[in-house]
C-alpha cells in the first residue's frame, strides 16, 4: 500500500483547512508569487512609482510586448508578480470595476475601492469549489486626493504601504527600503530608490529588462518611463551600487586587518 502524506487530503480541496489552520492551496499560490519576477512600489510626496523586472528569456521576444505594469484607469496602475495569465484576469477585472464606478458616480474610482473589489474576488477563489486561488500578487498604485500604494495577496488580504516589494527579490528590496526610504522623497528620488532596489535583486539590470511607471500628484495621470529615461536613472543608480560595493569591501578588509 502506497504511503499517503498526512496533508494529502487537505491538498486536494481549497475549501478544507488542515488541522493546523492552513489552506495549502493558498500557500502554494503564494509560492508562485515568491518565484515570480520582482516588482516594487514607492510612494513619495509628489506621486507614486511602480517598477518591475522583466524576465525576457529569449532575444527573439520583443521587449515592448512583455508587459508587467498595467494601466487600470487614468490615475491607477498595477504591477504583477506570479502567473502572468492570472494577473491579466485580475487586471481586466480592475479595469472593469474602474469604468463601472465612473459611469455610476461620474467620478474617478478611489484606489481603495478597486483594491477591495479585486481582493473580494481573490478571497472568493479560496472559499468555493471548482476554482483555485489566483497565483499572482498585485501592487496597486494611484492618486486621488493623495498618493496611495497597496499590496494584494493571493488570499484576498491587502495592505497599504509606503514602499513595498513582491516576487523573488522581496526580502532584499524590503531591506533596502527599510534602510533608505524617507517620507519627504521627491519623485526622482523615489524612481531612483525603486530602480536601486530592483538592480540589487537582478544579475544584469538594463533598460531593456526594467519597466517603470509613475503617477504624479500634479496631473494624476499614469505614465510609463521611456527607455532613455530608464537608462539615465539606471546609470546614476549603478554608480551608487558600485560605490556601496567598494565601501563593503573596504569594511571587510578593515575587519580582516584588525585580526593581525
Swiss-Prot record:
Q: What does this protein do?
A: Component of the proteasome core, a large protease complex with broad specificity involved in protein degradation.
Entry's Gene Ontology cellular component terms: cytoplasm; proteasome core complex, alpha-subunit complex
What is this protein's name? Proteasome subunit alpha
Q: Which organism is it from?
A: Pyrococcus abyssi (strain GE5 / Orsay)
MF GO annotations: threonine-type endopeptidase activity
Which family does the entry's similarity section mention?
Belongs to the peptidase T1A family.
Question: Which terms does the UniProt entry file under GO BP?
Answer: proteasomal protein catabolic process; ubiquitin-dependent protein catabolic process
Lipid metabolism in keyword set: no
Q: Which Pfam family, an example, fits this chain?
A: Proteasome_A_N
What PROSITE patterns does its record include? Answer: PROTEASOME_ALPHA_1, PROTEASOME_ALPHA_2
**Encoding gene (name):** psmA
Keywords carried by this UniProt record? Cytoplasm, Proteasome
Assembly: The 20S proteasome core is composed of 14 alpha and 14 beta subunits that assemble into four stacked heptameric rings, resulting in a barrel-shaped structure. The two inner rings, each composed of seven catalytic beta subunits, are sandwiched by two outer rings, each composed of seven alpha subunits. The catalytic chamber with the active sites is on the inside of the barrel. Has a gated structure, the ends of the cylinder being occluded by the N-termini of the alpha-subunits. Is capped at one or both ends by the proteasome regulatory ATPase, PAN.
